Amino acid sequence: MTSDVETTAEQQEVLIVTGMSGAGRSTVANALEDLDWYVVDNLPPQMLRPLIELANRAESGLPRIAAVVDVRGRNFFADLQEMIQSLREGTKVRVLFLEAADVTLVRRFEQVRRPHPLQGNGTLLDGITAERARLREIRESSDIIVDTSDLNIHQLATRITDIFADENTADVQVTVMSFGFKYGLPADADLVADARFLPNPFWKPELRPYTGLDEVVRNDVLQQNGAEEFIESYLEALRPIFAGYQRENKRHATIAVGCTGGKHRSVAIAEELAARLRSLPGLAVSIKHRDLGRE
């Protein structure tokens, strides 16, 4: 006979929020509370299971629990890895990892005039480097990675809302993001496509002032040899990927499309790709142009 606690656990969803110090864990916790998650901040990994058991015994139940976990301690890191594997046997568990570029984290710590928890007698960058190395394994096994480097607290809260607010109405939340390779790969991309095989409108003086959002550039990009074949082939490759995401309950995916500067080709291809993805069932598609206007 299955107990009520076990039955409730199978229906329960647990989100573990972790990541780099200064990357926005408190902001994420507040955003999740606004979405009616039951949030516990600074929870030691050893307390995850007792928390879930207590939640299951609550009269009304707590179907969505978010635990903000600090794993900077070496023992805490090992404990969290083991606890996640154990919990996944009877509970739906996902890990949200927050990160940001070193220069961003240094600036944030300097703004609040606080030392990094791991810097000791070293510099801020020493502490950040040590923490990044310690968290590498948990980052690689995370279900969702959000790079907060270019986000203020309001934009981060919006991003979390975009990821989690409509989960009951669509199986996979898909973000299609254009970017410029010269500014670096998006750290939170699940899939990356390279549009640099297409001729660059930048070298056409009449198109240079415009962007991939403008019809004249978009038409120029999409009519190039190989553009349509690429989009159709990529969509065909994405179908089994999204089917697998749905089977594995992966609710969020970021597809990054890059060109040299993130102004022409990647923007046009990303817009077209997003438009066609919206016709597929079980997807909620949004679009972001990371580097547009940056030049």
Swiss-Prot record:
Gene3D superfamilies recorded: P-loop containing nucleotide triphosphate hydrolases
TM regions (residue ranges): none
InterPro entries: P-loop_NTPase, RapZ-like, RapZ-like_N, RapZ_C
Residues that coordinate or bind GTP: 70-73
Keywords: ATP-binding, GTP-binding, Nucleotide-binding
An example Gene Ontology molecular-function term: GTP binding
Chain sites annotated for binding ATP: 19-26
Family named by the database record: Belongs to the RapZ-like family.
Function, in words: Displays ATPase and GTPase activities.
Protein name: Nucleotide-binding protein Lxx11490
Organism expressing this protein natively: Leifsonia xyli subsp. xyli (strain CTCB07)
